Structures are given as C-alpha cells and as structure tokens.
Amino acid sequence: MRTVHLAARRGYALVEVLVAATVLAIGLLGGVALLLDGARAARGARHATAAAGLLSDLGERIRANPAAGDAYAIAANRSPEPPADRCESTCDAASIAAVDLADWRQHAEAVLPGARTAVAVATPDGGTARQYRITVEWTVAGRDQRARLDAVVVP
C-alpha cells in the first residue's frame, strides 16, 4: 500500500478554491458587462423610437395644416411663441402651426436627452410643392456623441 504524506498535500484544496473563485468572479463580471451593454442598447433603441415618433407626429401636423406654409419652418432649437389663448378660440393657420411647434418641441425635450429640433422648408426644382425636412438630435447616454434622425415630409 502506498503512503501519502499529508504534508505534501496541504494547501492544494485552498489553491483549487481560489482558482474556482477567480473563474467565477470573471464570469460574473462578464455577465454584468453584458447586462449593462444590453441596457444601454435598449435605451438607445427607445430614444430612436421616440425620435421616429416625433418625426411622424410633426409630419402629420404639417399635413393636417397645409395652409400654414412656411410657418412650420424653425431654426435649430427655436420655436415660435404660441398665441396666448393657445388657439382655444379661432386661430389662423400660422397660429395653429406655432402651437403645434411649441407642443412638439416641448414633447421632444421631455422624451429625448439634450433634444435639438429643426424644420427647414424647401421647394425643390423651383416648383410649388413644398418639402419639409424635420431634424431631431439627441445626446447618446454615456457617450459624448449625438444621434440624429431626419425625415422629409411632402404634404
């Protein structure tokens, strides 16, 4: 029969436990990193979806008020002042556009971090049909970058 010296085997169990704990810790850190990356991607997708909804919303408002013409044109981060009564009484097309833009801009600031908005009006080829280029920008969370989404609306 073979005799095993206990003195030679001492400490091996502790080393095995330390190696297993290290492997487990590395695995847990990798899992946490994946969760954080997934949450960041979900937040980015949520912001892109909100921006697409904002573009669609203003596009529908422009289509619903074709008489407003250039009243929907706004420089970056500017909104015209809406009428004091917010069109609760009768309003012309330009006043309705001012209310639409003020509401839309307020909503953009509520759903997108660092929101910037702009609407440019053009008549390509010297024609009479107007095109509205709607732009929404926002700050990407956790980065010093901005995301941007544009749409062209032809009423």
Tell me what each language-model feature is:
Residues M1-V4, G114-R116:
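Short coil-to-helix leader/linker segments, especially the first N-terminal amphipathic alpha-helix
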Residues R2-A8, Y12-S56:
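Aliphatic-rich helix starts adjacent to a transmembrane/signal segment
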Residues V19, R40-T49, G53-P155:
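Flexible, low-complexity segments enriched in proline/glycine/serine and punctuated by aromatic residues
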